[in-house]
């Protein structure tokens, strides 16, 4: 959806991996972004997000909020072009991960892994504006 000439923010959802109960915590981060242009569903987009730690804040006793910055450019083939004519769309925004700890955290490290990217659409659809990425993220808290 366009809002005054701007594309909406990405939806970023970190999900804690089953069995990840101590630091380093492993998350799967789902990133969903509406693209500026329709893209060919059959051609995989390129996107490698870079995660960086921004801050940690105390929200209650033994409860903290870690703010992480995500940045990367989605490179994709628009439906009205050819493979030699790609488009790029930047994602640069923050998201938060809640943390419970009896000890006050003194350091936080984030590290991203190799994502799986796709353009998703309805069956038999050739083009879509919905980009989805699943990216692993390791969060070390000391």
Where are these regions (language model features)?
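Viral structural modules
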Residues: 1-142
């Amino acid at each position: 959806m366009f809002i005054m000439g701007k594309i909406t923010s990405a939806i970023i959802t970190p999900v804690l991996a089953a069995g990840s109960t101590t630091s380093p915590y492993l998350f799967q981060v789902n990133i969903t972004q509406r693209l500026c242009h329709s893209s060919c569903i059959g051609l995989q987009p390129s996107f490698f997000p870079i995660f960086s730690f921004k801050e940690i804040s105390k929200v209650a006793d033994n409860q903290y909020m870690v703010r992480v910055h995500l940045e990367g450019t989605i490179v994709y083939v628009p439906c009205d072009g050819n493979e030699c004519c790609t488009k790029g769309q930047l994602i640069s925004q923050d998201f938060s991960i809640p943390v419970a700890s009896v000890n006050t955290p003194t350091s936080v490290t984030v590290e991203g892994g190799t994502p799986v990217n796709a353009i998703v659409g309805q069956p038999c659809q050739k083009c879509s504006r919905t980009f989805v990425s699943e990216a692993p993220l390791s969060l070390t808290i000391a």
